[in-house]
Design a protein with these regions (language model features):
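N-terminal cap/lid segment of alpha/beta-hydrolase-fold proteins
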Residues: 1-18
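Active-site glycine-rich loops that stabilize anionic/oxyanionic intermediates
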Residues: 22, 30-33, 212
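Catalytic nucleophile-loop/oxyanion-hole region of alpha/beta-hydrolase
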Residues: 32-34, 61-86, 91
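Conserved alpha/beta-hydrolase
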Residues: 37, 42-66
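Alpha/beta-hydrolase-fold enzymes
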Residues: 97-181
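Short beta-strand/loop motif that positions the catalytic acidic residue
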Residues: 202, 208-210, 214
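Short alpha-helix in the alpha/beta-hydrolase fold that links the catalytic acid
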Residues: 204, 218-227
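Catalytic active-site module of serine/aspartate enzymes centered on a nucleophile-bearing elbow/loop
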Residues: 232-264
């Protein structure tokens, strides 16, 4: 199944369905990756009576669009399109990882959508280390003269997981890319900052998870968001985990925590 965006792009979607699901998890994946990397997550939830639906973000995976480039508002609109396409008569849970965590969290805060809640994994609310001033200046300049130019996203595959098989599969995956545009990185950083500043606008329950050894997105920013959001945000910290909790050697523990939260 595919979706057609307002500006004419085709978005690729996937569904892992069970009969009479008690809930459906709606995935927004991270930067440079694609929804196919979550098949094991989908299968886990299927085994527990929960359907799983996903789409490849524009410029990612099997979807159309320039690799690594999008206007932030376009992605918000694409999430709306995706959610509206789902014909389930059961609670929806928005699940976003990394950049997808940034998008999902902003979507929940800005739109208060008709969902039961959200699972937010290692969201890109800020970088672990502040961007050097000269690089920030260059990005702002490029945003004016060449906003969609493809730059390297700087993600070190060795930092996504402590599981070498996961890293090797990521590196060899032809649908994974390492691109990002000046416009998208600046808009995403601004959106992460906005989410932190507006955490008290949270009106839906969320499970926020993050590994303490994440060197790709800021663990401290997640801590701060949880503190500001209050009781609707349950924060679960994983000591020593890298960027992708669902792909760590202890992933069964992470998935069990997600399921427990859903059932609670």
């Amino acid at each position: 199944m595919t979706l057609r965006t307002k500006d004419g792009l085709t978005l690729y979607t996937r569904r892992w369905d069970v009969e009479s699901p008690r809930a459906v998890i709606c995935l927004v994946h991270g930067l440079g990756e694609h929804s196919g990397r979550y098949e094991h997550v989908a299968r886990f939830f299927n085994e527990n009576g929960i359907s799983f639906a996903a789409f490849d973000l524009r410029g990612h995976g099997r979807s159309e669009g320039k690799r690594g480039h999008a206007e932030y508002q376009q992605l918000m609109d694409d999430i709306t399109l995706f959610l509206q396409s789902l014909d389930y008569d059961c609670p929806k849970i928005l699940y976003g990882h990394s950049m997808g965590g940034n998008l999902a969290l902003n979507y929940i805060l800005r739109y208060d959508p008709d969902i039961a809640g959200g699972i937010i994994s290692a969201p890109f609310l800020a970088l672990p280390k502040e961007l050097p001033k000269h690089l920030f200046f260059i990005l702002k300049l490029l945003n004016v003269v060449a906003p969609s130019i493809q730059l390297s996203n700087g993600i070190d595959p060795n930092l996504i997981s402590r599981d070498r098989e996961v890293v090797e599969a990521y590196v060899s995956d032809p649908l994974v890319h390492d691109k990002i545009s000046p416009r998208f990185i600046l808009q995403s950083l601004e959106a992460g900052k906005w989410a932190l500043e507006n955490a008290d606008r949270l009106r839906k329950p969320i499970l926020l998870i993050h590994g303490t050894a994440d060197q790709i997105t800021s663990y401290r920013a997640s801590q701060e968001f949880a503190k500001r959001a209050g009781e609707l945000c349950k924060f679960v910290s994983y000591e020593g985990f890298y960027h992708e909790p669902h792909n760590e050697p202890e992933k069964e523990r992470v998935l069990a925590d997600m399921l427990k939260w859903i059932e609670g």
